[in-house]
């Protein structure tokens, strides 16, 4: 498997001309593969688009369908970005695809994401599948993936402030960019949003004549606790963390025509119930409008078997895990913006109110204090690390200083392994046995490399 492809070399900066004309020109030279792919579902949003895509992928696979999928970024291997009929693209085919792109594009400048998108569209156009799931890289309107003219469905997940230097200073302007994936007369599933965000999306939908299926209006998905209640917020059982919600909790999906209970999804956190709702809503449209045969049992199986790494992932083995006592736990999460921090902190509050150790690293454009403020009551020790796989990483000294400014005990560490072995395991803190690694998906990549 390939960590980074041989071509193109990263430009080190984003191009100034955010236009789709360059992408359209490149694709034209390659025979317009974007017009020859299996039916496409296009997914945008600030948070939750990868999880929503994964839920859909596993649900549809459970129903017997072949699914192509394109996501970004990758954690360890570049091949992770391109799933061809259920399997990661193999090294030889990926190499050939990129060589084909390079030959057609010649010496014209191209970003890594643009090249990956073109390679994905090429391979999807050459392999049979029933549906193609495509995740937007950033924004929507001018994203390289938005050369798809005729998706059968679009989805917009949770919207929040992120990448403001590119997408705009307010959630409303960002929503407008996300709405750019809406297409004329193509239905759009929208996660529950703040009122001003939903209003913006509705205005764009009117202009596009795009029928909306809105969370909180046409559908709703929420956790339902059974009569059995658990006094504490989490149970320790055989050294395995089990959330209190598993003790009798389920989720219920409701629309104008149905109200169905499902088990909680495999991905942890209440926010994943919303993402699962996005996927169920989308599947109901696929069944009702396009004739896909997706039953309740397929949804149940898909939700329970979905795997999407670094989303509140409990890591059970590896070099670093072997350092921990048996009753300790380590969770890995790619949360990197303020909204992601908020929902992650809610999960910590619900399950580990006694406190956690945090290993934290971010890229330079992130507000350290704003992110960490959500976790202030729970962090007993913060280990600041530099994100090694990201050239634009924040210096550990700045992280430590930002944490100290808001009253969090923080130290600088050379690596994740150094943080665990030389600091966390030697910290004199009673009854805290949980480590959370977060701040960047690139930090999750560093962990995967160190943990082997």
Regions found by a protein language model. Give the residues of each.
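Active-site-proximal loop/hinge segments that shape catalytic or ion-binding/gating pockets
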Residues: 440
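Short internal beta-strands
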Residues: 70, 187-192, 358-361, 380-388
């Amino acid at each position: 498997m390939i960590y980074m492809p041989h071509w193109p070399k990263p430009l080190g900066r984003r191009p100034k001309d955010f236009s789709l004309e360059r992408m359209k020109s490149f694709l034209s030279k390659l025979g317009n593969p974007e017009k020859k792919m299996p039916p496409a579902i296009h997914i945008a949003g600030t948070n939750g688009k990868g999880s929503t895509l994964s839920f859909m992928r596993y649900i549809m696979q459970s129903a017997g369908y072949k699914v192509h999928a394109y996501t970004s970024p990758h954690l360890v291997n570049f091949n992770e970005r391109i799933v061809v009929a259920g399997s990661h693209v193999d090294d030889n085919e990926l190499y050939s695809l990129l060589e084909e792109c390079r030959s057609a594009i010649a010496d014209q400048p191209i970003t890594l994401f643009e090249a990956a998108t073109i390679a994905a569209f090429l391979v999807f156009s050459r392999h049979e599948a029933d549906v193609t799931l495509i995740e937007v890289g950033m924004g929507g309107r001018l994203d390289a993936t938005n050369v798809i003219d005729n998706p059968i469905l679009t989805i917009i997940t949770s919207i929040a402030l992120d990448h403001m230097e590119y997408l705009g200073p307010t959630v409303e302007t960002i929503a407008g960019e996300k709405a750019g994936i809406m297409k004329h007369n193509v239905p759009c599933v929208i996660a529950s949003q703040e009122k001003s965000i939903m209003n913006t999306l509705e205005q764009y939908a009117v202009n596009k004549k795009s029928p909306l299926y809105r969370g909180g209006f046409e559908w709703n998905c929420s956790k339902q606790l059974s009569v059995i209640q658990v006094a504490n917020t989490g149970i320790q059982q055989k050294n395995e963390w089990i959330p209190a919600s598993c003790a009798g909790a389920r989720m219920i999906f409701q629309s104008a025509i149905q109200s169905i209970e499902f088990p909680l999804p495999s991905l942890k956190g209440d926010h994943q119930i919303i993402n699962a709702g996005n996927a169920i809503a989308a599947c109901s449209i696929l069944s009702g409008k396009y004739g896909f045969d997706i039953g309740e049992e397929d949804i149940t199986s898909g939700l329970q078997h979905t795997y999407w790494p670094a989303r509140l992932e409990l890591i059970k083995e590896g070099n670093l895990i072997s350092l921990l006592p048996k009753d300790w736990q380590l969770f890995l999460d790619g949360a990197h913006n303020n909204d992601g921090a908020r929902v992650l902190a809610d999960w910590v509050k619900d399950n580990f109110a006694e406190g956690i150790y945090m290993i934290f690293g971010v890229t330079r454009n992130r507000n350290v204090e704003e992110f960490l403020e959500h976790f202030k009551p729970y962090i007993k020790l913060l280990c600041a690390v530099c994100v090694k796989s990201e050239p634009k990483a924040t210096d550990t000294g700045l992280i430590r200083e930002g944490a100290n400014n808001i009253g969090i005990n923080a130290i600088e560490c050379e690596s994740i392994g150094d943080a665990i072995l030389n600091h966390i395991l030697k910290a004199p803190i009673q009854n805290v046995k949980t480590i959370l690694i977060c701040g960047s998906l690139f930090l999750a990549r560093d962990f995967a490399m160190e943990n082997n």
